Amino acid sequence: DGWAYDIGFGGLDHVLASGENVNVMVFDTEMYSNTGGQASKASNIGEVCQFAAAGKETSKKSLSEIAMSYGYVYVAQIALGANPAQAVKAITEAEAYPGPSLIIGYAPCELHGIAKGGMNHCQDEMKKAVKAGYWNLFSFNPALKAEGKNPFTLTSKEGDGSYQEFLNNEARYTRLVKPFPERAERLFAKSEEVAKERYEHLQKLVELYK
């Protein structure tokens, strides 16, 4: 959860930097789920949780790119419900990679307050997150560089325009609308804009690593 992005980040970074053959999987709930739903550097813009009662103003940390900056860490973002094949492939590659690996999996949480079906539909919620462009699927495999191949693979496509619909299906966002309607509109628009910029950045990484 938020631990990996925040109070536990120093330890995680030390493990990845060591170069040891260690596999790490982070279940990204975008908050501190185990301690009751506090805001973290994993939390997204506009998200309402403890310590961010008026919606988080800033965007989430790019944990994946920090790990990728070492150049020798296998990194992947997955969402099992959205693309099981990509998730299994990433896990298999991470296990086979002779060095540190980090897999960040999108993890719907009870505290997200999924409106339609709750956690019974968490797999569908993952699909919606990827389809909307809220969560991106990609992998960075340093081993491919030695084979003369592009180590960065972007699997997910650009958002289909359902970003606001996705936000409005989760109480962690909609609970901002009634008390602060203008702020909610501004933060939700900002969140979508940042998501589009993030995807454009990922597309540029595909070209950069060629």
Protein language model regions, located:
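Active-site metal-binding loops of divalent metal-dependent hydrolases
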Residues: D1-G2
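Glycine-rich ThDP/TPP pyrophosphate-binding loop and its adjacent helix/strand module
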Residues: D6-V22, F27-K157
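Conserved acidic/glycine
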Residues: M119-K210
